[in-house]
């Protein structure tokens, strides 16, 4: 069954005729060509598919596209504004908080969601907030350092 689903994606209106039960991950990657959102485990365990929905980090491999109707979705492609990296993206680069890069989009968006809800997290709060995101390269310590640095640069999660 085809539904008309309208939402905002990376600050732009989107209107799709699509099966509303289709996973947001596949709509983003296949239908809209936004491949920064990664398919990792398909079960919500790794965090590679994380996007922001109304500012909250969610796993797009578990979210049906009909669940984002009339909401704001942000992918890694929409995080930088006017060619300027978001403070979290900048901090990841400055702290060398990536290696292969596969987990990075999900890590960055999870961190943005965390800092939006908790602008001044402790290291322990960052660890808890990021524990559902996996990095097989072992960059976790640098990722936490980057998030702490970004928190210092950001004002109220923005």
Describe each PLM feature range.
Residues 1-158:
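Signature of N-terminal electron-transfer/Fe-S-associated modules in redox systems
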């Amino acid at each position: 069954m085809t539904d008309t689903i309208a939402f905002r994606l990376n600050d732009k209106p989107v209107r799709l005729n699509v099966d509303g039960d289709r996973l947001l991950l596949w709509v983003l990657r296949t239908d809209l060509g936004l491949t920064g959102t990664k398919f990792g485990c398909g079960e919500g365990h790794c965090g590679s598919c994380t996007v922001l929905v109304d500012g909250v980090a969610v796993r797009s491999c578990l979210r049906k596209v009909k669940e984002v109707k009339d909401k704001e979705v942000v992918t890694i492609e929409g995080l930088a504004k006017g060619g300027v990296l978001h403070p979290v993206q900048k901090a990841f680069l400055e702290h060398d908080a990536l290696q292969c890069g596969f987990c990075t989009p999900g890590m960055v968006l999870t961190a943005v969601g965390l800092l939006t809800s908790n602008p001044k997290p402790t290291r322990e709060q960052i660890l808890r907030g990021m524990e559902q995101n996996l990095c097989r390269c072992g960059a976790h310590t640098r990722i936490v350092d980057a998030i702490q640095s970004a928190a210092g640069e950001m004002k109220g999660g923005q």
